[in-house]
Amino acid sequence: MSSLTLSRRPRRNRKTAAIRDLLAETHLSPKDLIAPFFVKYGNNIKEEIPSLPGVFRWSLDLLLKEIERLCTYGLRAVMLFPIIPDDLKDAYGSYSSNPKNILCHSIHEIKNAFPHLCLISDIALDPYTTHGHDGIFLNGEVLNDESVRIFGNIATLHAEMGADIVAPSDMMDGRIGYIRSKLDQSGYSKTSIMSYSVKYASCLYSPFRDALSSHVTSGDKKQYQMNPKNVLEALLESSLDEEEGADILMVKPAGLYLDVIYRIRQNTCLPLAAYQVSGEYAMILSAFQQGWLDKETLFHESLIAIKRAGADMIISYSAPFILELLHQGFEF
């Protein structure tokens, strides 16, 4: 049987692994990944989170060893989240401004141990509040301006401790401009701001809240986090944060919002981060544990999709696992 007369045969560019690699448009490397870690008081603690298999709450001593191990695989950036005991929480999140809290102490110690590492700190109140909201909660409402002033103080404190980048995750109006001003006035003009500029009110955060032992006791976060139905609002939020002085923008969650990542990428020249959140990680792990899908290729494919949509960097709980695979030369 004679061959068809075709001027173009795209399959020629897929016929061997070498050709496919040569022509690949999107690549994943250790430099693309930010590893998030939960740190708590104590010693010799590595406590697996039930809703996040393979993710742990670490005491600082063991976290330092884990970071050292991952640096041999090419780890370049970490993001820290604190586990705060209930007896240190109050309605105002006062402990967030204590320079001796576990997050401040961890920033200082990790930066001293790994000065080459990019250290990103979480700027939020929900780990420290009894009500679980991301700001001061009064009479059924999260107070915007009063909360923003606290975030400015926290950001300055983290910069003093050694954070390279502060990452406000609260979604209050005007917080980027206020934090930038506070940092500059305090002598930290070199400290960058990674803004959670587009943070949707998603159901995919539940395992993260389990990890922090932080749950909303009254109301919800829909009055300040974004409506999943909207994308033009995402463009507005990101442009406002850019105008206010953000150095890096972020979309959270990532996997269900690839269109948003793409749209923002077309509208900004700033670096763009995406957060593959706890629920995304948990869904992939659940499918693997049920024997339905392959963990290695699914994590890789999900991260490639996020990069292909336009993200320059990805925060993912799979980062330690992927770093090991990349180091081993795993063929995806």
Swiss-Prot record:
Disulfide bonds: none annotated. The active site is at K199 (schiff-base intermediate with substrate), K252 (schiff-base intermediate with substrate). Its EC number is 4.2.1.24. This is Delta-aminolevulinic acid dehydratase. InterPro entries: ALAD, ALAD_AS, Aldolase_TIM. Belongs to the ALAD family. Pfam families: ALAD. 5-aminolevulinate 2 binds at S278, Y317. Keywords: Heme biosynthesis, Lyase, Magnesium, Metal-binding, Porphyrin biosynthesis. Pathway: Porphyrin-containing compound metabolism; protoporphyrin-IX biosynthesis; coproporphyrinogen-III from 5-aminolevulinate: step 1/4. It catalyses: 2 5-aminolevulinate = porphobilinogen + 2 H2O + H(+). NCBIfam families: PRK09283.1. One of its GO terms (molecular function) is porphobilinogen synthase activity. Gene3D superfamilies: Aldolase class I. The keyword Metal-binding applies. One of its GO terms (biological process) is protoporphyrinogen IX biosynthetic process. PROSITE patterns: D_ALA_DEHYDRATASE. Homooctamer. Catalyzes an early step in the biosynthesis of tetrapyrroles. Binds two molecules of 5-aminolevulinate per subunit, each at a distinct site, and catalyzes their condensation to form porphobilinogen. Mg(2+) binds at E237. 5-aminolevulinate 1 binds at R209, K221. GO terms for cellular component: cytosol.
